[in-house]
């Protein structure tokens, strides 16, 4: 069976989202629609009743095969604020721990008339595989798959940047740390280039910043000062030791000495630069507490914006499913 192209698999025949698997193939119009819709949801956090009925009567299943705090919780909050019923599958106590295959687990959940799966998995391409094998009327949202993609994280980062900088025009952005193992960096780079940012710098040691990222439109910097010089946005990434094989860096202390973001190294960026981090933060490894908690940090804003972005993506995907000619109901009407 041939693997579907990302754009063809993610959009219905009207060009609307029906799955959200990767930013690869999605154009500026769709990304901007996600940001605009998320902006409209942000004000809900200030209301006494933080709900809208857009997913009322729908069942959302969180399938997290990797540990998560922020992503799983914000997806659950987003679904509940859209009035959906939410099921959090405990993978450790589910039948998958007894040897049941991923596909069999999904087919059983489909039989329970689930409407949307939020999937995090250690294997790259897992969300794509699920979208290809699920019934057409179930929406699949990728909450992170291996090194491949983390599209909702990238979009909440884009919303954070836009809200603090106004637009993406002329911005200089540095992404610092373990680029090699980061699905976040890959999705961020796709989003930034699609939204028109031409100066994106990937900063870190040669072992963690492969040269092939230049083909995606980034500038590679192995010197922190050169990477941070006059940038508007600094995105710090943690060292993903759980994915590392072999000696990719001498030590955490050496990494911090060469690439850690401190008040001194942040001074190389613009005076009004913002500092971002997708979490979890390792203080004293990639970032100092003074910077993480300082006036330039928008890290907690990212978490807040994540709820709104995930509400936007989930509501758009469900709407795209309902308007798709591929749904069983639509086929019955023909």
From Swiss-Prot:
It catalyses: carbamoyl phosphate + L-aspartate = N-carbamoyl-L-aspartate + phosphate + H(+). Carbamoyl phosphate binds at residues 70-71, 120, 150, 153, 279-280. GO terms for biological process: 'de novo' pyrimidine nucleobase biosynthetic process; 'de novo' UMP biosynthetic process; amino acid metabolic process. Pathway: Pyrimidine metabolism; UMP biosynthesis via de novo pathway; (S)-dihydroorotate from bicarbonate: step 2/3. It holds the Pfam family OTCace. L-aspartate binds at residues 98, 183, 238. Its EC number is 2.1.3.2. Catalyzes the condensation of carbamoyl phosphate and aspartate to form carbamoyl aspartate and inorganic phosphate, the committed step in the de novo pyrimidine nucleotide biosynthesis pathway. Belongs to the aspartate/ornithine carbamoyltransferase superfamily. ATCase family. NCBIfam families: asp_carb_tr (TIGR00670), PRK00856.1 (NF002032). This is Aspartate carbamoyltransferase catalytic subunit. It comes from Marinomonas sp. (strain MWYL1).
């Amino acid at each position: 069976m041939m693997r579907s192209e990302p754009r063809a698999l993610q959009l219905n025949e009207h060009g609307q989202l029906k799955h959200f698997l990767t930013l690869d193939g999605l154009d500026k119009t769709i990304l901007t629609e996600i940001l605009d819709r998320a902006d409209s949801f942000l004000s809900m956090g200030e209301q006494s009743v933080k709900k809208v009925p857009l997913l009322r009567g729908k069942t959302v299943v969180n399938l997290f095969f990797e540990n998560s705090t922020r992503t799983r919780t914000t997806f659950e909050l987003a679904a509940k604020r859209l009035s959906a019923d939410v099921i959090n599958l405990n993978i450790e106590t589910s039948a998958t721990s007894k040897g049941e295959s991923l596909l069999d687990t999904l087919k059983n959940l489909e039989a329970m008339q689930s409407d949307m799966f939020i999937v995090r998995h250690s294997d790259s391409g897992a969300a794509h595989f699920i979208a290809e094998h699920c019934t057409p009327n179930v929406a699949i949202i990728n909450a992170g798959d291996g090194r491949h993609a983390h599209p909702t994280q990238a979009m909440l980062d884009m919303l954070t940047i836009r809200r603090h900088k106004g637009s993406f025009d002329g911005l200089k952005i540095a992404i610092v740390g373990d680029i090699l193992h980061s699905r976040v960096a890959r999705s961020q780079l796709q989003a930034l280039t699609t939204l028109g940012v031409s100066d994106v710098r990937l900063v870190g040691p040669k072992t963690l910043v492969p040269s092939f990222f230049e083909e995606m439109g980034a500038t590679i910097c192995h010197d922190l000062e050169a990477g941070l010089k006059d940038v508007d946005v600094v995105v710090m990434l943690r060292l993903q030791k759980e994915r590392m094989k072999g000696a990719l860096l001498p030590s955490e202390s050496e990494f911090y000495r060469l690439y850690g973001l401190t008040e001194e190294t942040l001074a190389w960026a613009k005076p009004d630069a913002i500092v971002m981090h997708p979490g979890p933060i390792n203080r004293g490894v990639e970032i100092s507490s003074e910077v993480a908690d300082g006036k330039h940090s928008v890290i907690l804003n990212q978490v807040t914006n994540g709820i709104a972005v995930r509400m936007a993506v989930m509501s758009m995907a469900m709407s795209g499913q309902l308007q798709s000619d591929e749904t069983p109901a639509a086929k019955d009407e023909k």
